[in-house]
C-alpha cells in the first residue's frame, strides 16, 4: 500500500539489467504490465518491466498515444483473431465501436477482410466509427439494436459478435448472432443472463481477459502478447491502424480522468501524462 494503478505504459529505457538483450538505454518502448495482481502499476514516472513483455514504440505516434494502446490492442486482437477466429468475408458486430477497445476492433476486423457493423450512442460517434471503416452503424438509442442487426443480415445474424459492454448487451448479442456463430465478451456475464438463445443457436461463447497471463504468471502467454504489440507497431507505422486520443490529463488529475471514463461520453482513449 498504497496501490499503484495503471496497466499500460510507454517511455524511454533509462536503465537495463546485465542480461537484457532486446533493448538499450534510450530505446522507446510500450507495454501492458502491472497495476493488478500485486504488480506495481504505471501511474508513475518510472516502471520496471521484463524486456520480454515490452515492444518497440511505434515511431509514428507520440508517447501519449503509445501509452494508451497496449491493453486495447491486445484485447481486440485476441478477441477477434484468437477467440473469434475471424476470417475474411465474415460479418462482425462490435458493440460500442467508439470506445477504447471498440475503435481498435473495428480497424482490426477491417484489416482481416470482415464486414463490420457497430453500435454507438450518438451521431458524433457514428461519424467517428465510419471514419475508422465501419460498414454499418446502429444508433442503439434510436432503434432496436437486435432488429437492426437482423435487418442488416437478412434475418440471419452476424458470424461474430464482440461484446465490450456486458450486462443485457451480452443477452442481446445471442439474438444478433447467426446459428453456429461466435460471441466474445470481455466482461463477466450478469447473473440474470438468459442463455437459452445461445444454446438454441449452438453459439460458441468465449471470454477475453488479456490480463489473465499477468495475473496467472503465464510467462509464454505474456511473451506472445508482446509479439502482438510488435505486429501492431508495424500496422501503426504503416498507417493501417490508428489510436485515437480524446483527452489527456496530468497524472495528478487521475481521479478526474476516471470520472470522465465513467460518463461513457469519450471516444477512443484517455491518457495520463507525467511531467517531462
PLM regions: where:
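Short, surface-exposed secondary-structure boundary micro-motifs
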Residues: 16-18, 34-35, 97-98, 188, ...
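Glycine-rich cofactor phosphate-binding loops and adjacent beta1-alpha1 units
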Residues: 137-206
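Glycine-rich beta-strand-centered segment in the early N-terminal region that forms part
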Residues: 1-35
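Residue-level marker of beta-strand positions
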Residues: 27-28, 46, 91, 111, ...
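C-terminal substrate-binding/catalytic core of Rossmann-like NAD(P)-dependent dehydrogenases/reductases
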Residues: 147, 197-247
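NAD(P)H dinucleotide-binding glycine-rich loop of Rossmann-like/cofactor-binding domains
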Residues: 22, 32-96
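C-terminal capping/lid region of NAD(P)-dependent oxidoreductase domains
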Residues: 233-247, 255-276
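Mid-domain Rossmann-like dinucleotide-binding core that forms the NAD(H)/NADP(H) cofactor-binding site
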Residues: 67-143
